[in-house]
UniProtKB/Swiss-Prot annotation:
Belongs to the HSF family. Class B subfamily. Keywords: Cytoplasm, DNA-binding, Nucleus, Phosphoprotein, Stress response, Transcription, Transcription regulation. GO terms for biological process: regulation of transcription by RNA polymerase II. SMART domains: HSF. Exhibits temperature-dependent phosphorylation. GO terms for molecular function: DNA-binding transcription factor activity; sequence-specific DNA binding. GO terms for cellular component: cytoplasm; nucleus. Its main location: cytoplasm. Residues 276-394 are annotated as: Disordered. This is Heat stress transcription factor B-4c. It comes from Oryza sativa subsp. japonica (Rice).
């Protein structure tokens, strides 16, 4: 194995070797992005120069990733992009950018380097068992241990490499805690990163963490606002339901409107009855009296009912009084005499159908055969005979 004269020479040689060939991940990523057959899934960005967009992540992970890598995990692909310095351009879609990842300039991929972590233990795989050489002291005085460690790793790196010292140890208690970072990484066998690259990696991680925290905070605020709005709408809904159930009653019609509607219904039912009364009274041949019916405004239904009962009672009382007491005209007793040729039979109830409560019939007696008999005052009560046709009122 060829030895380097100093650490700077070894680092320069390693950097030159790495620049000659880009990382396989970058080469495969460039190929899958530059493939025109899959532009509907992944393609160059809007500027078609320095960004690329994954339009359909599910299809990208299912159909494209297995063709270039040994997995189909989209999250793992994104993590690899982050380790090589790619950044997400906009949060709305999976668009990534890197200043050296440009269309038609594949040679620039050698300028893209993997970010180095601050501790080699986080980037290295689990170590094999440590077998120290016989001349390598595990426990020494701190000052002597530091000097021997530095001499062993720098002067005799072949022996160290042969024994696998380049791997991290489960319990590295043999190292000095207060040694510089470069010395510790040298003891572990990994290349010591320059301070600028370490600071850049730390700044990149800090920026990514800040962006993620800001996005989480924004989502949390949005979620809180939505929950508050939902609770407010539920409260309004419950208040409306409570108000309708406990404070709203059906509106009853006013008395005037109710009477008007009831009157319309009763008149519609009673008009045929009034027409029948007119027809029956006009066609009667058993009485010479004429019946004249005059329409008057109908009172309310309750008053009509009371008036009907009252008129019925008065008619019964008056007919009974007329049958028991003599008839007088201007203080002169009248004797009933048949009108016309002879006495007429009493009219049957069928000939006089009941009239409607809305109409009050007025009876006008027309009889030409009325006879008056004036008896002397000394004689006992003699009645005047008057011929009149008996009429009945309903």
């Amino acid at each position: 194995m060829e030895r380097c004269g100093s650490w700077s020479d070894c680092e320069a040689a390693a950097a030159a070797a790495q620049k000659a060939v880009p990382a396989p991940f970058l080469t495969k990523t460039y190929q899958l992005v530059d493939d025109p057959a899959t532009d509907h899934i992944v393609s160059w960005g809007d500027d078609r120069v320095s960004t690329f967009v994954v339009w359909r992540p599910p299809e990208f992970a299912r159909d494209i990733l297995p063709n270039y890598f040994k997995h189909n995990n989209f999250s793992s692909f994104v993590r690899q992009l982050n380790t090589y310095g790619f950044r997400k351009v906009v949060p709305e879609r999976w668009e990534f950018a890197n200043e050296f990842f440009r269309k038609g300039e594949k040679q620039l991929l050698t300028e893209i380097h993997r970010r180095k972590t601050s501790s080699a233990s986080t980037a290295s795989p689990s170590p094999p068992p440590f077998f120290a050489p016989p001349h390598f002291p595990l426990f020494h005085h701190p000052g002597v241990a530091a000097a021997q460690h530095h001499h062993a790793f720098v002067g005799d790196d072949g022996v160290v490499a042969a024994h696998g010292i380049g791997m991290p140890f489960p319990q590295p208690h043999w190292r000095e805690p207060n040694l510089p970072v470069a010395t510790r990484l040298l003891a572990l066998g990994g290349p010591a990163p320059s301070p600028s690259s370490a600071e850049a990696g730390g700044a990149g991680r800090a920026a990514t963490a800040a962006v993620l925290m800001e996005e989480n905070e924004r989502l949390r605020r949005s979620n809180t606002a939505l929950l508050q709005e939902l609770a407010h709408m539920r409260k309004l809904y419950n208040d409306i339901i409570y108000f309708v159930q406990n404070h709203v009653r059906p509106v009853a019609p006013s008395p005037a409107a109710a009477a008007f509607l009831q009157g319309l219904g009763m008149q519609a039912r009673k008009k045929p009855a009034a027409a029948n009364v007119l027809n029956n009274s006009g066609g009667s041949t058993t009485s010479s009296s004429s019946l004249t019916i005059a329409e008057e405004p109908s009172p309310p239904p309750q008053q009509q009912h009371l008036a009907g009962e009252k008129s019925g009672g008065e008619a019964g009382n008056s007919s009974a009084a007329r049958s028991s007491a003599p008839t007088k005209l201007f203080g002169v007793h009248l004797s009933a005499a048949p009108c016309g040729a002879g006495s007429k039979r009493a009219s049957s109830p069928e000939e006089h159908p009941p009239t409607s409560p809305a109409t009050k019939p007025r009876l006008v007696l027309e009889c030409d055969d009325l006879s008056l008999t004036v008896a002397p005052s000394s004689s006992s009560q003699q009645q005047l005979s008057a011929a009149s046709s008996p009429t009945s009122t309903s």
